[in-house]
Curated annotation (Swiss-Prot):
Name of the molecule in the record: Ubiquitin-like protein ATG12
Pfam families attached to this UniProt entry: APG12 (PF04110)
Other facts noted in the record for this chain: Small amount of ATG5-ATG12 conjugate is enough to perform normal autophagy.
Chain positions covered by the region annotation Disordered: 1-43, 68-98
Glycyl lysine isopeptide (Gly-Lys) (interchain with K-149 in ATG5) cross-link site: G186
Biological process terms in GO annotation: autophagosome assembly; autophagosome maturation; autophagy of mitochondrion; cytoplasm to vacuole targeting by the Cvt pathway; glycophagy; macroautophagy; nucleophagy; piecemeal microautophagy of the nucleus
GO MF annotations, alphabetized: enzyme activator activity; protein tag activity
Family matches, as SUPFAM superfamilies: Ubiquitin-like
Function of the protein: Ubiquitin-like protein involved in cytoplasm to vacuole transport (Cvt), autophagy vesicles formation, mitophagy, and nucleophagy. Conjugation with ATG5 through a ubiquitin-like conjugating system involving also ATG7 as an E1-like activating enzyme and ATG10 as an E2-like conjugating enzyme, is essential for its function. The ATG12-ATG5 conjugate acts as an E3-like enzyme which is required for lipidation of ATG8 and ATG8 association to the vesicle membranes. ATG12-ATG5 rearranges the ATG3 catalytic center and enhances its E2 activity.
Amino acid sequence: MSRILESENETESDESSIISTNNGTAMERSRNNQELRSSPHTVQNRLELFSRRLSQLGLASDISVDQQVEDSSSGTYEQEETIKTNAQTSKQKSHKDEKNIQKIQIKFQPIGSIGQLKPSVCKISMSQSFAMVILFLKRRLKMDHVYCYINNSFAPSPQQNIGELWMQFKTNDELIVSYCASVAFG
């Protein structure tokens, strides 16, 4: 008796040819097609059908063997995953601490008739949002509204991370922030 297990992704008309045997294949095909088409729970019936086919092929494994394999391997796998997770977490924390400590230079350039900051270069933590720069300028210039631009080209979102802006748009290891009292561009 030859039995062949083919792909389960066949069309519905081809599902009857998934298992072929030398004797009784026509009867089995018609019974399988009727089971698939007649029931409202097709997914459940398909699973039962595939389970039956596996048992006919002798590929269904013993449940007790599967449980023993799971019990013996699950403990070591979980321990390994816990160790890996702890190591990754500690690396991320140390990297995050280094990133928080690292400060970048911001060079402020006035646009128009707004006053100039002295000193024009300040340092800020990379983890701060751009809203902190806007707030700093408002306080130092004693103004209600300040419009900021990076490299005289675009106005970043207040939620944008200063470290990301610095990595992408730095000039001579400084982030150039131009500021003005009214909208300068666009």
